Amino acid sequence: MYFTTLQRLYSKGHLRGLVRSLLKQIIVKCGGVPYLLANDSHPDIVYIGVDRSRDVFGDSPSLSAGVAAVAPNGEYLGADTTNLDKYTDDFIDISSILPSIITQVKQKRPGVKIIVLLRDGGKYNISEHEVTSAIKITKEANLDLVFLSANKSSGFRAFIKKDSEIKGFSCPVAFYELPNDPEDFLIFSTLPKQGTQTPILYSILANTSSYSNNEIKQLVSNDLTSLCSLVWEAPSPTNLPLPLHYADKLAGFCKTIQHPWASEIETPLFI
């Protein structure tokens, strides 16, 4: 399942972490939600994944955008869908979907202060109007916003050397800033049992919180790596973070049935 040495596997503390990770995955595979096993280190932050699904071969647009919200510990907080423009990947109007998901989030997490929006796609494919609309909506809800582009197609597996050998890298998660653009950063795991998640490339398109961009990078690097371990469809540690995984499943499902998400479904099982 994981490529590692027996010496590392049975080293002090490593076996405990491996069992803890596998226990979460076993619970997910059996249909449970193991968020109670995770540390809720940031109760004031919620992650919202945004993804889209397109059918370019159909006569009708048949396009859907899925939005799913989870807490940093993996607790499911809500989901919704909207339509996309037939000729573009951008949303027709993001204001038609964010308010409803924020309402669901506030009902379950009244102490939320920061929304971290994970938008699938490269930063150059996301319209400025979408970013400004998201800022306006969260401001009206008295929330701060961190808007991140996250291109799923940029994933690959990689392992990092020991923490002491790479300047600025912290164990077990590390972020690496790209020299061409300080708002772009990669997320790596320094633990072989985790591998590298998908996607690894993120870009900060907006940050209205009191955190600096560097603090945001470290915070989301830790949280997103943890959220990857809560997805278990195949024996691979290169999964999407939970909110993007949920949004991807939701968008594809609603595109297929050509019908919006049913609000009566309170807790779906996206596996």
What do these predicted ranges mean?
Residues 1-271:
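Long, contiguous domain-sized segments
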